[in-house]
Amino acid sequence: MKTIKKILIVLLLMVISMLGYGAWILIGSKTSNPNNYKTIGDIPTPWGYERIKGDDAAYSEFLRSLALKGRGADVMLYTGGRSRFQSLNYAVMDIPLLSNAEQCADVCMRLRAEYLFQTGQYGRIRFKNVNGKTLAYNGGSSRKAFERYLRNLYGVASTFSLSREMKTRRLAEMQPGDVFVYAAADRHGNHKYGHAVMVVDVAENKSGKKSFLLAEGNTPARDIHVMRNFENPFRSPWFFLDDDADLLLLSVFPYKSNELRHF
């Protein structure tokens, strides 16, 4: 009788534990930054994975140092109010938007430009507009001039110009700072709408398999945020890379394997 009682107690504890774990997963999947991480670099890698330095170690560390808003922060529209589909957001980045035109491609250019500006590489801040003309920044260390440059850039650049300007990268060679981008329109009229997301961190296991974090903005303009991976059973933000995949579903957006780009 005592043995049966012990078994029942053990089973009851297991059920309670499983229910608690399930509740933790459910709550975590609906709450932004559930563990209150301070920066992107604080987000733990998947088990068995280690962060890579990347070809530009300073750029990798800059992206990992980007601050996150606290637990439960909503993705807010630039014009005010909560954006739709909050569950797509894993953590909100603590970077105020500069204008209502700062959308997906603009966010990718913004993060790249912020790195160059904050490290004093002013002469390397240059992007092309939709007509292929290079727009170079020449305001030096002036934050006001830098932000004015970006606001002007947002009005004349897009996923189309970004995809043409950046160079292709093989998935197996993915680096922090790379961008998945498909253009809103190309010469053949493909894609009514475009989208771009930035790889803000990359980790690798001993077998060379990569995992990565993505950040995005969207239309209408909203807070930059780390994306949640709904295919991950733990609702983790880490995406896993299949080098042989022809099509990648990143959150709700599909990308072809040849749509990974780098600056």
Sequence positions of predicted segments:
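Extracellular-facing segments of soluble proteins and assemblies that are Gly/Ser/Thr-biased and enriched
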Residues: 94-173
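...with weaker cross-activation on analogous glycine-rich loops/strands in unrelated enzymes
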Residues: 144-210
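N-terminal module-boundary/linker segments of secreted carbohydrate-active enzymes
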Residues: 24-85, 98
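Low-complexity, Gly/Ser/Thr/Pro-rich intrinsically disordered linker/tail segments
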Residues: 211-263
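Hydrophobic alpha-helical membrane-insertion segments, chiefly the h-region
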Residues: 16-24
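N-terminal hydrophobic targeting/anchoring segments and the immediately downstream early-domain regions
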Residues: 86-90
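N-terminal Sec-pathway targeting helices
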Residues: 1-15
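Short loop/turn segments at secondary-structure transitions that flank enzyme active sites
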Residues: 114, 203-205, 220
